[in-house]
Amino acid sequence: MTDDGTWSDESDWELGPDDISDAIEEVSAPPPVVAVVGRPNVGKSTLVNRILGRREAVVQDVPGVTRDRVSYDASWSGQRFMVQDTGGWEPDAKGLQQLVAEQASVAMRTADAIIFVVDSVVGATAADEAAAKLLQRSGKPVFLAANKVDNERGEADAAALWSLGLGEPHPISAMHGRGVADLLDAVVDALPTISEVAGAGGGGPRRVALVGKPNVGKSSLLNRLSGDERSVVHDVAGTTVDPVDSLIEMDGKLWRFVDTAGLRRKVGQASGHEFYASVRTHGAIDAAEVAIVLVDASQPLTEQDQRVLSMVVEAGRALVLAFNKWDLVDEDRRYLLDREIDLQLAQLQWAPRVNISAKTGRAVQKLVPALETALKSWDTRVSTGRLNTFFKEIVAATPPPVRGGKQPRILFATQATARPPTFVLFTTGFLEAGYRRFLERRLRETFGFEGSPIRINVRVREKRGPKARR
């Protein structure tokens, strides 16, 4: 290995400074985010599919179909961006207006631009008007997509949507592609090169998301931490509407708990509450730096618990596992819980675990050290020289599996970014998923990273051809 951290046999491979800087920029610079919001059956998912040029989003906004918000990679006119499909829910007049407004509210915080889809045939509804009022105050570029415009009469229907106060409606047909190119031209022109919302909010109190499945004790814990007993907490999620964030002092330090309004609103009996909870959870995680995922220790781990944990890891946020209702856990349950953790959460052994009771206050003070540990790991950077020395020793002791009769080698390694720690490996061949997991384990053993996901990106380089004779 040379003084600059590269390995001596690297000269035979196509790897220059531009390769490294381009890879770092691609990994560390999050693309801008475009959120697609609107009522059920207005064509949101059809529009997303049209933007992507492939059929990926679920297109059935029918009763009983609920799902999470989903993000997709997209590109238009050379501009890469992420499309957030806010999905569908169970349509019901009782909760519809609130749910559409909820989409708009989350999009305002988590997107760089918003496409608001309205059915031009139906016209503006009360739910559309409520969402439009929110979007007017967002300060974000908002594009009004008047969908289902297939003829000149439809153009007139689209023009009527000026009444929403969001500027000129863009008449489109998501089904047939009419007008979508013009809409995307306008959207891309308004986008920043790099997302201004991903990981935004540097400085000030560290941002914490308190998330978990419904009725796991989030409101009780928030009240316990804040000393605020204004909220009446029952066996169903809910209370009154509070400001979006809560500043809470713990151990003499201010913490910003994001999106606490979602914890203080009674949604347990509302139509579409599963969708509402999913949108709120995604929004809180996106706005946070670290997430406390609350799990009911008195009950078996559920698919919902694992889904929330996956959201945190996929978003690249620091993580603290808090097992609540510990006052209800007896010896038998502790034994079963340990087995469940070993079997179902084996990939999250790096997350600090705190056993608490929001009801009695048991061990809640231990959350602060766990949060600080997770955030310190999340912020960690490893020098390039130290990293390459580490990988050279690891590969010498345990080389990657042979593929196609050839032994892949790691030419160079660098940490592209922190928050979360993201590493780029330039190699001579593909590294199997199992070997990547091995490298992650060894990285954790050597450098810690307790409480933070880490990411490993592999870039395979081509060998240079024979040099031309002079």
UniProtKB/Swiss-Prot annotation:
Keyword field contains Signal: no
Domain of life assignment: Bacteria
UniProt KW keywords: GTP-binding, Nucleotide-binding, Repeat, Ribosome biogenesis
An example molecular function term from Gene Ontology annotations: GTP binding
Gene3D superfamilies membership: 3.30.300.20, P-loop containing nucleotide triphosphate hydrolases
Residues annotated to bind GTP 1: 38-45, 85-89, 147-150
Keyword GTP-binding annotated: yes
Residue ranges of domain EngA-type G in the record: 32-195, 206-379
SUPFAM superfamilies: P-loop containing nucleoside triphosphate hydrolases (SSF52540)
Domain KH-like: 380-462
InterPro entries, sorted: AAA+_ATPase (IPR003593), G_ENGA (IPR031166), GTP-bd (IPR006073), GTPase_Der (IPR016484), KH_dom-like (IPR032859), KH_dom-like_a/b (IPR015946), P-loop_NTPase (IPR027417), Small_GTP-bd (IPR005225)
A Gene Ontology biological process term: ribosome biogenesis
Family classification: Belongs to the TRAFAC class TrmE-Era-EngA-EngB-Septin-like GTPase superfamily. EngA (Der) GTPase family.
HAMAP family linked: GTPase_Der (MF_00195)
Subunit-level organization: Associates with the 50S ribosomal subunit.
Role description: GTPase that plays an essential role in the late steps of ribosome biogenesis.
PANTHER family attached to this UniProt entry: GTPASE DER
Name of the protein this chain belongs to: GTPase Der
Gene name per UniProt: der
